[in-house]
Amino acid sequence: MQIHNFSPGPARLDPSIISKSQEAIANYQKTGLSILEIGHRSKDFETLINALQENMINIFNIPSNYFTLLLQGGATYQNTFIANNFDKENKLLGCLVTGTWGRYSVEDFSKIRDTKIIEVSDNEIENYIQTPWDLEGVDYLHLTSNETINGVQLREFNKIEHDSLLIDMSSDIGSYSFEWDNLAYVYAGAQKNMGIPGVSICIGDEKYLNSEDNSRYLNLGQLVEKNSLLNTPPTFSIYVLKLVTDWMIAMGGINHFEEKSIRQSSRIYEQLESYGDFVIIPVSDYSKSRSNIIFKFKNEDLEKKFLIEATEKGILGLNGHRSQGGIRISLYNSITDEMVDYLSEYIDLSLIHISEPTRPLEI
């Protein structure tokens, strides 16, 4: 049975990336060494990391005055990292909270530096973008562009009237284009759209580099100066990230993945909305995530049945987050149209079967 993996992360990888990774584990670039053995200060790895940085500049259209970093610790580490940088003693950090991960961030930030919390429900995001709330005194504004647990996405951050945004893009980076004009710093764990766990992509404006007296792995200036090699980096995760960026460029870059994201998410949302008698989509239209579609059945028993039968059909990763329940469909960059076809057919058959129990549930 073919598996269709819609996991929220670690997420599906394109088969070509898995195949190339397997080859590199056996023998990297005909060196006789496994990629797992390559020294992080070797010429081979230097070539790899430089090529990766060029790929990221290409994909994200990164300006020349921005740095790129590859760090460990995931997006959660970034809560501590950000709080200890960006002039923590003198600058107020504002936090736009639209869901669970943004709330976790502000809880961590507030233990380290002065923080202003701005709570915005999914129903208020559109109004907030059009008429920003009180940002008086806020020197940096942090937000999470896509809340994987809540199914809320804020893509129009370039319209926010603030010139120093800090953005957690862990679950939607690479799925739509954006401008850098008002972005101070962007970060993303790789394991959803860009690879596997272990490495985080960090991109920032060089004018925010500081000389704060932080310990080494909290010292933004030192990390940039050492080009992500202050200590031993997650070499294999970086290698897979390089493969993903190669693949993204070959597929057509950001424009390709943005078009695909719009097409696939629109199809599933429209389908679910046609079954309003059975399911609830708890997010307002403007804020609906293209990356993580959240919905619940009105009947809890039918929801359990839907998940069990999906697994039997080879459709995996649909369970909502343990804190929310429900269903979560994750449509990251690696999800193919064929996978969405299969899922869509299952949704139709499953929900028709609810109203016509004698009808066979076969795809």
Give the residues covered by each predicted segment.
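Conserved N-terminal alpha-helix of the aminotransferase class I/II PLP-enzyme fold
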Residues: 30-81, 100, 108
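N-terminal "arm"/small-domain region of PLP-dependent enzymes with the aminotransferase-like
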Residues: 1-39
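Conserved PLP-binding active-site segment of the aspartate aminotransferase-like
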Residues: 5, 294-298, 315-345
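Active-site phosphate-binding strand-loop segment of PLP-dependent enzymes
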Residues: 109, 120-173
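Active-site C-terminal subdomain of aminotransferase-like
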Residues: 190-269
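PLP-dependent aminotransferase-like
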Residues: 76-141
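Conserved PLP-binding catalytic core of the aspartate aminotransferase-like
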Residues: 279-309
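Single conserved hydrophobic/aromatic residue that forms the stacking wall/gate
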Residues: 352-363
